[in-house]
Design a protein with these regions (language model features):
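Terminal cytosolic tails of multi-pass membrane transporters
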Residues: 1-10, 383-405, 426-521
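Loop-to-transmembrane helix boundary motifs in multi-pass membrane proteins
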Residues: 8, 13, 131-138, 226-229, ...
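Helix-loop-helix junctions that connect adjacent transmembrane segments
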Residues: 2-7, 42-45, 50, 121-132, ...
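Membrane-interface "cap" regions at the ends of multi-pass membrane proteins
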Residues: 1-34, 38-43, 49, 56-63, ...
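Extracellular loop-to-transmembrane helix junctions
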Residues: 8, 31-136, 242, 249, ...
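TM-loop-TM module centered on a large, flexible mid-protein loop between adjacent transmembrane helices
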Residues: 77-80, 84, 115-123, 194, ...
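Membrane-helix boundary/coupling elements in multi-pass transport proteins
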Residues: 71, 94-109, 212, 216-225, ...
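Membrane-interface loop-to-helix entry segments
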Residues: 132-183, 195, 236-240, 368-377, ...
């Protein structure tokens, strides 16, 4: 029998830090190094630093939000507090797509690497699964569903163990590859052979921002954290700083250990020569044992990240339902375990669905990256809005210098979305505008008891304008568009648009914060 219960505060700082690090270290680090090298050359090191800075700035903003009302599914509910239910609806839709498909991506990545040992898991000459391969994916999803079904502490213990195991290999890779380090590689063909455009493009197209996106699971479990006002900020900052250090060292180690003769044709072909960067470089250098460990870790790392998002996504669904713009059944929390089980069942079903039409890792990576950044990007405007309409809200973690950090972090988020390219931006942001229209068409079904529909629309117009202007800029720009606005003027244009939209969004928040029906879980 399922009774309505409450979330249980069982997660410690260690648990939360490992959730953050574990979510960040999935399949991204295993693919990105060679892609970044092909797009930016050695200057890809700067791409990793810029990506880390962007996520750190957003993480600091999330510290203020996550500590000052810690709520399950906070990524959805904070915009509802500041700008109304329509904002929660738009964020809920895009975040559910991103999180649920990310579970599938990681499980698919684990299966693709496992095919190096068990070829019958993948179709010959393809990353697509055989029937047996798909059933293996399904079994993994069932296993992670079971881990998350009974207790959040069961999930945390399993995640801590997986995280420790999967970090040993990247650290070992760094140490071993540095023993082959050749400094002259960093100047082969010039340090930045593709200029600043290459550095920018690598952040999105190279998989860097995908590799970093692991903060929202920390926010999603905020109601289950012991001493959240201290634990959430420390765990967020630790996760980003540690991951940035490891990623930069991995990239430098990869760049410096490539045999010099393989660079004679330039950097552009490196991703073809090293499609699985660290496995392939280990084989090239004659270290079969390291290649074996990399493949082993390549199975464990994505699986661990998939487990984390199997835990985080139900909290997002719960937050969306609590906002009043999704089915009420998903607000139910099991009384004994403290798990939002209806939301977990939906997550499980969606994660299976995403393995059907999009069977390979490469086909979803760009879309999921942009979708996740969109869910992150709203945080600075939400925090600015709550400072205006809820100035007395207790803020145990108060971000100083927010007048600079807020707009800068929003601008960087907008640029990352723009750098994803026209093919991704056009349909993803277009779909969000369509969802806005659907909300208006079903005006008799939407919640208006706390905030009128007129006010919800007024407080959300800035986001729709943001989507529309980024679509136009992407079409006219140099990242997959018609190049009517060349680089770097297109990037500068998007930055100016984002700055204007930030202040529009901050100043059109609700007159009073919308905490109607919100009580601590």
């Amino acid at each position: 029998m399922t009774t309505q219960g409450k979330f249980k505060k069982q997660l410690t700082l260690t648990d939360l830090t490992f959730i953050g690090l574990g979510a960040i270290f999935g399949s991204g680090w295993l693919f990105a190094a060679s892609h970044v090298s092909s797009i930016a050359g050695p200057a890809g090191i700067y791409s990793w630093l810029i990506g880390g800075l962007a996520v750190l700035l957003l993480g600091i903003v999330y510290c203020e939000l996550g500590a000052a009302p810690p709520r399950a599914g906070g990524i959805i509910r904070y915009p509802v507090f500041s700008h109304g239910e329509l904002m929660g609806y738009l964020l809920g839709f895009i975040t559910l797509i991103a999180f649920s498909s990310l579970i599938s991506i990681e499980i698919v990545a684990a299966r693709q690497y496992a095919a190096a040992w068990f070829p019958f898991l993948s179709q010959p000459g393809s990353g697509n699964p055989t029937l047996i391969g798909w059933l293996v994916q399904l079994l993994l999803l069932c296993f992670f569903f079971a881990l998350n079904y009974y207790s959040v502490k069961t999930f945390a213990k399993s995640n801590n163990l997986i995280s420790v195991i999967k970090f040993v290999v990247p650290l070992l890779v760094i140490v071993v590859l540095f023993s082959f380090f050749k400094p002259e590689n960093l100047h082969s063909q010039g340090f930045a052979p593709f200029g600043s455009a290459g550095v920018e493009a690598a952040i999105s197209a190279g998989g860097i921002i995908f590799a970093y996106l692991g903060l929202t699971p920390i926010i999603s479990v905020a109601s289950e954290v012991q001493n959240p006002q201290r634990t959430i900020p420390v765990a967020l900052i630790l996760s980003v700083v540690l991951s940035t250090i490891i990623y930069v060292l991995l990239q430098v180690a990869f760049l410096g250990s490539i045999p010099s003769e393989m660079l004679s044709g330039g950097w552009a072909g490196i991703s073809q020569q090293f499609s699985l960067p660290y496995r392939d470089i280990a084989i090239t250098l004659g270290m079969g044992w390291l290649a074996f460990l990399v493949v082993s870790d390549a199975i464990i790392s994505p699986s661990g990240t998939g487990n984390i998002y199997m835990n985080a996504t139900p909290r997002v669904v719960y937050g969306w339902a609590r906002a009043g713009t999704f089915f009420k059944i998903f607000t139910r929390v099991d009384g004994e375990s403290g798990i939002p089980r209806p939301a977990l069942w939906l997550t499980f079903a969606l994660s299976i669905f995403w393995t059907l039409p999009f069977p390979s890792w490469e086909k979803l990576i760009g879309v999921v990256s942009a979708a996740l950044v969109l869910s992150y990007a709203i945080a600075p405007v939400t925090a600015a809005g709550l400072r205006r309409n809820a100035p007395d809200l207790p803020r145990p973690f108060f971000v100083r210098g927010f007048c600079v950090l807020g707009p800068v972090s929003f601008i960087i988020s907008a640029l990352i979305v723009y750098w994803s390219g026209w093919n991704t931006v056009s349909w993803l942001l277009g779909l969000q505008i369509l969802m806005f229209v659907v909300y208006i068409l079903f005006k008799n079904k939407v919640p208006t008891h706390a905030v009128s529909l007129k006010q919800q629309i007024w407080s959300s117009l800035w986001l729709i304008a943001f989507y529309a202007l980024i679509i136009i800029a992407s079409y006219l720009g140099s990242f997959g568009g018609i190049n009517a606005i060349g680089h770097p003027w297109d990037t500068l244009t998007v930055a100016v648009i984002a700055l204007a939209i930030y202040y529009w969004g901050a100043y059109t928040c609700l007159p009073q914060a919308n905490f109607a029906g919100d009580e601590e879980e």
